[in-house]
Amino acid sequence: PQMCILIHNTPKSNLTEAMFRDFIIRNGDGFGAAWSDGKKVHTIKLLDPTAKELAYVYNQHIKGRDAIIHLRMRTH
């Protein structure tokens, strides 16, 4: 079955550009992430991202945090 990818990123997680490259082979239709700084929930969305863009966003905003990451697979 076709499915999106949902990742629970922990403070110890370390996703790499190579991992994102693998993820977007089948799930490259969109990216979303959400995390809290204790005061506010932050979100980010990208359409048709490259692995390089995802790695940059991950390293700047998500790495070292509890976060939810969603990689979309178009199903229609």
What is each model feature region?
Residues 64:
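Short beta-strand or tight-loop elements
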Residues 1-53, 67:
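Extreme N-terminus nucleophile/cap motif
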Residues 46-57, 61, 69-76:
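Short acidic (Asp/Glu) patches
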